[in-house]
Amino acid sequence: MKTKNHFPGIRQDWFSPLYIGLIKGLKVFFFYLAVLCLFRALYIGILHAFWADGTRLTDAIYAFFRGGKLSMQTAGVLTLPTFLPGFFTGFVSSRMARCVTLILAGVFLTVLSVLFAASFTYYRTFHANFNQMIFVGVQDDRAALFWTMVQQFQLPLRLLGALVLGAVLLFLFKKVYDAKCPIVRIFGENFWHELLWKLPAAPRLGIHLSARVLFLFFVCLIAKLSIFGGGLGWQTAVDWENAGVTRDPFLNEAILDSPQALYRAYRLNGRMRACNGLDFTVEDIRNLAANLSGKAPTSDNLDDYLTRTAAGAKIAKPRHVVLIISESLANWPLLDKYGNIPISSGLRSIIAADDADYCPTFLPNGASTVSAVTGIVTGFADANLYLTTMPESFAAPFPTASAPTMERLGYRSRFFYAGPATWERIGEFTRAQGFSEFVSRGDFGDVPGSVWGAEDEVLYEKFFEHIDPNTPSFDVLLNASNHSPYDIDLDAKGFDKEAVRAALPEKYRKDEELLRELGHYWYADKCLAAFVREVKEKMPDSLIIIVGDHADRYHIEKQPNTYERYGIPFIITGKGVHKGTLTANSAGSQIDIIPTVLDLIAPKGFSYEALGKSLAAGNDRGVNYGFWITRDAIGKSDTDPLVPEGLDGSEGAPIDDGAMQNYINAIRSISWWRPKYGATLDEQILKEKGR
């Protein structure tokens, strides 16, 4: 690359072309960032009519700056294909390098302008930034879609305006790209150059090298910020899944620039397309459903096999049903063998109380939080369907959905989430599945927390702000603190790390990371216990359920046995509950929670649909995506025959292999067919829709 000598009297070296090239790369990056931020500001301002009631200017400013952090990632992605071809071409010809860069910049700026122009109409139509509806539109009648855009949305005029905008931006880009950066003059011209040469050789060389190091450090810093969406690591990164933290749905969408919104649509559509079918025939499903329900396999309506009739309430109907899904709440700290480690005293005290019962043989619905949410919200097991992205989930609540069933019993349903409403589309998903109200971090204001959500104590505090003790309610709370990056100030919360360290086996006492993880379990446990006490004090007529979303995140042992690795607790407490409320041989998974609640409180004759069964009525097995469990054993669900493993890791006692296989297949096949194909069991549907 031929460059002007900006250091007269100093021999040009390898750094000069690198420096000039990187300066141009920074210009490209900051120009893209400025364009994206300008577009966001205009988007927020022009569409201000879509601001939610109560949204303030400060909320919009916060969304603008949070979006700016996210757009650093977008700008970085756009900079690479714009800048790198020209940079390497520059070693052959500076003129050619400039030409290549301007052409590529023109293409990208035009695309950004077209997307910007389209985003207004898109939001007015779908009340969202670009989303999965784009892929639905691709499958639609394209001719009709085209003429609709021409006639209703003035496509030619908008496209012309976008092209003009792209041309203006390219003109400005050329001016910025060709302009001399003031930093160049610092290194070779006028006052600074003359001042530098007046210094002795050694200081001059030191300043020269220091300037290079600082410049390269700045470039690396910008690169890191662009990789992590305005953060210095993934712990503080803003991405499309955690971006929406305001209380305003419109502002949450505005945080995403157009490329990020398109990426979101692509990822969500990919998840939905990954929902492959399971290998069951219609006849298989009919027979399995009949066997599960104890009915004859004579109906082609799958819902007939899911319909239950309550035998009658076992406890007085509570005014409130509160279900806490606690992040990474594993069961192993509650086992007797770990009783000396002081991280679970709160849950242990709840379990020990007379008004509580506890099932220690319980499985999560899947390996992640979203599986727990879908299992509890819809009543279906994890069956290789990404329910939070499937259109069927947003058409109407499934008949097994928890919120509509509880509302039929007179409860108002709410879902409280410590994180953003945009995570896994949880806000839209829970409302689509019948929850009357959704409350998330965006409703909390400026509160302490991590990238995943507000601190647990904040979530519980906000719960009481939304509750009327006199109005019956069904409330689900999903917390987030017991999650990496494990960055809560545990000392400020009162965690006695040294007491925990002393209780650990000698070989683990120096493991600071493990101590930090255990400290977050302690924090979750402490907040849970305090919350349960407060619920019982303020709303004594309440039924409270505590369950982990999943386990398998950390353990004292590096290779724990299967039960300790995957088991989660199921705790039920409140008025009317006593030891023995759950049967002695009870076992289950998250799809069994709502059936258990209904078995306890629903009046005789109450009709509902459910896949799971009640732990208060003898359910003695649970199954999820990869495992099964009973009161005495656990095992993988994909082996034939099934291989039992004792809860202590030893060889398990034999089980009825056929019965367990049928149960596993029934749960999976129904959880696959009903959400994806509906209630009708018809081979033709499978042929038309495919697996």
Regions found by a protein language model. Give the residues of each.
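Transmembrane and membrane-interface helices of multi-pass
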Residues: 2-274
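Exposed alpha-helical structural elements
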Residues: 17, 21, 144, 258-261, ...
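Alpha-helix initiation and N-capping motif
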Residues: 35, 142-143, 256-259, 282-285, ...
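General structural signal for secondary-structure boundaries
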Residues: 52-59, 128-132, 144, 148-155, ...
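Short coil/turn linker and secondary-structure boundary residues
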Residues: 55, 136, 140, 257, ...
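The feature marks either
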Residues: 248, 255-309, 317, 353
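Solvent-exposed soluble domains appended to multi-pass membrane proteins
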Residues: 293-691
